[in-house]
Structure formats: structure tokens, C-alpha cells
């Protein structure tokens, strides 16, 4: 009888230890954390780069799309200060003659990146959803580079590079045709199966 009384608490204690150890590192803490900062579209920045106040949301949606594709392996988190961000998004002028660019940096002993996006899209004309499409897909492409993804030659991939030619208008147009409202951007995936595989490979090396 005395043995059974002592044994039962020991089993409960063991169960508690197992439970606590399983909670010690949830998927969130096991994920690769990328803090990020997006340059505010101030009045001065808008004059210089033609950014819009909603562009920061497009950048956030792009990073959240990668996070969702990772299935919990990647976690993104906005921070208020540029210096505290592992990934930093800037708006640039048309003088750069590109849609965007990603440059590697070192952040707290980890791989980080500075991303530059051209938000001035005069070629979109009056179609604001096309303009939003171009800015969003550029953010998605360049933050993909920031996370470690390389260019591809497959037109279906968001990481496709125009160095291989292809129909640039259709690259953006195929996504634009899926949209009825701005909010559809966050609900519509532009990440291909190959992009997802490349993301998981990049994150496996951390």
C-alpha cells in the first residue's frame, strides 16, 4: 500500500516534467526569427520616391506570405527601429533603373539584408491595383533574396529573373487578374512550389 502511494506522485511528476520539456521550445521559439523594419512613407520620402502610405502594408504582406509558406519554420516580426531589424526595406527613386534590389548585411552575428524597392510605377497608368501588384511582387521577390533564395529561370516562380527574358507585363499581369480589391493581395499566393522548396532549403541552413 505504501509503495503505491509513493509511486503515484512520482508518475505525476514525471508527466509534468515531460509536459514542461515539450513546452520549453514551442514552434515559435524554434522558428528562424526575422525582425523587420519598413521605411515610413513620409512626405519627404513620397516626394523623392513616389511611395504611398499603404506600401508598408504591401511589404508586410510579402513577408507574411513567406512566413505562411514556411509552415512555422520562419517567423517575421516588425520592429520600430531600423537598427533593431534583421531585414530593412527602403523605398528608392526611379534613378536606380530597377524594380528592386537586396543587399546582404550582418546583423547580431546572423545573415540580414537591406531591401530596396522602387514604388514609382508610372507605367501602371490609372490601374492602381496593377501598381500595387508590382510593388507587392517586387517586395516578395527581394525579401525572398533576403531570406536566401536565388534567382530561377522558371517563369512560374516569384524568384524568376528577367535576365532570362520572358514577358515582363505578364509576370505582373497574371497576378493582377486574380485581384478584385486591394485586400485580395494578402489572400492570393504568388509563391510557386519551387519557391516553397527553395525557401525551406534556405531556412534549413539558417
Where are the regions that the model predicts?
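N-terminal secretory signal peptides that target proteins for export/translocation
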Residues: 1-10
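Compositionally biased regions
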Residues: 3, 22-23, 27
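Bacterial N-terminal signal peptides
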Residues: 13-24
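Zinc-dependent metalloendopeptidases
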Residues: 27-206
Amino acid at each position: 500500500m505504501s509503495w503505491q502511494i509513493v509511486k503515484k506522485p512520482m508518475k505525476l511528476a514525471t508527466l509534468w516534467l515531460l509536459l514542461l520539456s515539450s513546452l520549453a521550445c514551442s514552434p515559435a521559439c524554434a522558428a528562424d526569427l526575422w525582425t523587420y523594419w519598413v521605411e515610413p512613407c513620409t512626405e519627404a520620402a513620397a516626394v523623392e520616391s513616389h511611395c504611398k502610405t499603404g506600401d508598408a502594408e504591401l511589404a508586410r504582406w510579402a513577408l507574411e506570405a513567406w512566413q505562411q509558406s514556411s509552415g512555422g519554420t520562419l517567423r517575421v516580426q516588425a520592429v520600430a527601429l531600423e537598427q533593431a531589424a534583421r531585414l530593412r526595406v527602403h523605398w528608392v527613386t526611379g534613378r536606380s533603373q530597377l524594380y528592386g534590389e537586396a543587399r546582404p548585411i550582418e546583423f547580431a552575428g546572423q545573415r540580414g539584408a537591406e531591401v530596396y524597392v522602387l514604388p514609382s510605377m508610372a507605367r501602371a497608368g490609372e490601374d492602381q491595383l496593377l501598381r500595387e501588384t508590382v510593388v507587392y511582387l517586387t517586395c516578395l521577390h527581394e525579401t525572398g533574396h533576403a531570406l536566401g533564395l536565388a534567382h530561377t529561370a522558371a517563369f512560374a516562380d516569384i524568384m524568376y529573373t528577367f535576365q532570362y527574358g520572358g514577358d515582363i507585363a505578364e509576370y505582373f499581369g497574371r497576378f493582377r487578374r486574380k485581384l478584385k480589391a486591394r485586400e485580395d493581395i494578402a489572400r492570393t499566393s504568388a509563391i510557386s512550389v519551387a519557391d516553397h522548396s527553395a525557401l525551406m532549403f534556405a531556412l534549413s541552413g539558417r
